[in-house]
Regions:
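Glycine-rich phosphate-binding loops of nucleotide-dependent enzymes
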Residues: 2-272
Length: 272
């Protein structure tokens, strides 16, 4: 079965593309516990797709399935119309999938620049022997990678801290550096696990702006987990809602916020 290439029009009239990733009847177990229970949904080219739900709903487990960290016992992942065989995370990354983590995973003793450079590993083609024999080619590759990183640094407005060790940065800037490292991989699909966690209002506004700009200017498809419902409703084209490993809602932000099962399980009241 091929992916649905039919464009989709969002609530604000923006047209997004056909299906990039299709998750079909995904079930994930840890021992006798079902973390994900036969969930299906898709992610379309160019959209911002939110995954929400209470703590323990299985949201991060779903991101781990998408990124190859977890192997579901049942179900299939289809990427651009082809069934994806079992893959390790680095193989999934080579397909154009990058992610950030709920808990920041940066190299604290390294500079901002060097941390972001680690995101370019998939773009380094020359091995050590090739670098020794064809020094000029290796140098050109190094320059290209550094130029790509510098563009991201400018884009995320972190020029002033580019040489600062990450361990000295406040939390909000660390989250921005982690986003920069993920963008350095030039992903087609970017997975963000609670990108606003621990941020103050100003930091959330900045991160929201950057996420929208990444989607708009780079054309990057984004799937994100977020607990701030204001952020979710403002950023997302579509939202899937999980509760105790089940899917209880899926649709536009308006459809989700008016879904009675979602209100009862998670939102509490309809959000204006």
């Amino acid at each position: 079965m091929t992916a649905d290439a039919t464009p989709y029009v969002t609530e604000d009239g923006r047209q997004i593309g056909g299906v990039m990733m299709d998750l079909r009847d995904i079930t994930l177990r840890f021992g006798g516990v079902e973390a994900i229970k036969s969930i299906s949904f898709d992610i379309r080219e160019g959209e911002i797709r939110a995954i929400i739900g209470p703590n323990g709903a299985g949201k991060s487990s779903m991101l781990n399935v998408i990124s190859g960290f977890y192997k579901p016992q049942e179900g299939e992942v289809h990427f651009r119309g082809k069934k994806r065989p079992p893959m390790r995370p680095y193989q999934v990354a080579r397909q154009g999938v990058a992610r950030t983590f709920q808990n920041i995973a940066l190299f604290e003793g390294m500079s901002v620049l060097d941390n972001i450079m680690t995101g370019r590993m998939g773009h380094i083609k020359s091995n050590m022997l090739a670098q020794a024999i064809w020094a000029g080619k290796a140098q050109r590759e190094e320059n290209e990678n550094r130029e790509a990183v510098e563009r991201i640094i400018d884009f995320l407005e972190i020029q002033a801290i580019r040489k600062t060790p990450v361990g000295r940065l406040p939390y909000g800037l660390k989250k921005r550096v982690e986003l920069a490292r993920a963008l350095a991989a030039e992903p087609d699909l970017l997975l963000l696990d609670e990108p606003m966690a621990g941020m103050n209002v100003e930091e959330k506004e900045d991160m929201s702006r950057f996420i929208l700009d990444v989607n708009d200017e780079f054309g990057t498809t984004i799937a994100l987990i977020e607990h701030d419902m204001g952020v979710v409703m403002d950023l997302s084209d579509r939202v899937v809602v999980m509760d105790y490993g089940r899917k209880i809602g899926d649709g536009t932000p308006d459809e989700v916020r008016n879904n009675q099962e979602v209100i009862d399980a998670y939102l509490g009241v309809a959000h204006d």
